[in-house]
Amino acid sequence: MFVFQYGGLSQLDSWDPKPNAPADLRGPYKPLATATPGFHVGELMPNLAAVSDKYCVIRSMSHRVPVHNVANEMLLAGSSSPRKDSPSLGSIITRLQPAHETMPSYVWLQKFGGGAAPAESAWLSGGFLGTSVSPLLIGEQHADNPATPGFRPTPFASAPELTTSRLEARRLLLQNTTSNSSNTAPDPAGTRLQQLQNRAFNLLQSNAAASAFHVDAEPEHVRDRYGRHPFGQNLLLARRLIEAGVRLVSVVAWMGLAPNDRFVSVETWDMHGNAGIGIFDNGWNGLGWALPRADASMATLLEDLDERGLLDSTLVVMAGEFGRTPRISRGASAIGRDHWPNCYSAMLAGAGIPGGAVYGASDETAAWVRDRPVSPEDFGATILATMGIDPRTRLSPDGFTLPASDGQPIFSP
């Protein structure tokens, strides 16, 4: 499960507080002790602080590109210089570890949007691996999420008159048309197309797949616990999908709108102060609104997975494309922090990741990596290795030139 803090979370105000830094750097939040001795987080994260034994924080993420779309493409591919047709890590996992035919292998909750969005080819196409390993997208529009009353996933929202028998009749008609149109030797591309068509029909007819998307089947107290906002309900949906057999779920961490806010974009974490909301304010684009909700929802997810016996077999990742500048600046209309890729933080949990751990270290202002830098390649290799995939697996179009990752896992699986 990969949670994208789209826009770039401030490391100083969350995972890597610096209480001894000058006032114009450290911000207003005090450090908060976690359940792990010697490990502190920002004070807006009390719920994650209480379950620190379930995750590891990397404080030494680093690259050199302060541009949203490019940095997002790097994060998606696990590469500092991805090709235009590089598959995302999600598509690689889908190719090597597909789900059962009656479940989608890869689901994406909440579409990237706004000026920070990576090219759709970087996450929706499957790259050179092809569209068969691209994700099933839920959340084309910002309101298309389980927190919206009456939510129903578009891929499963077929017309009432399209009964199971009519759908099966269409499948048979398609098969007959295909078989009658070719009297020659089977074409590999045509065979693959038929396989994909059959998989699509299986998904449409799968009660298990459709029911996994019904978040309203959850008890009200569970929905309340996750949070009645887009991010909380998407995390709950992600848990249901993983539990049902989906191999990978990506979630864009859009936290929804604060009271009286108008919709601007889903770039919650891009907190320059340019949207009329300061980074420390309580609007949709401020930490005062976004971080407590992310904290409560993520802590609930980790506890819920653990209680269900799923955490040991489920990798949970939370990261953005970069961090924020140590120095607080003035944006167009309020104060904020700007893009900072040189040193930032990410979280990993489950699937054998050591809990209660901090990997790497930053300097006294969280501006530069002091110890054990983690590149996009290393981060990607760590995800693959934790999923049981050898990063050296050859996946390039010719079958041997390019490995799945050029990085080194920071943990041994």
Where are these regions (language model features)?
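Ligand-binding pockets and gating/stacking loops
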Residues: F2-P413
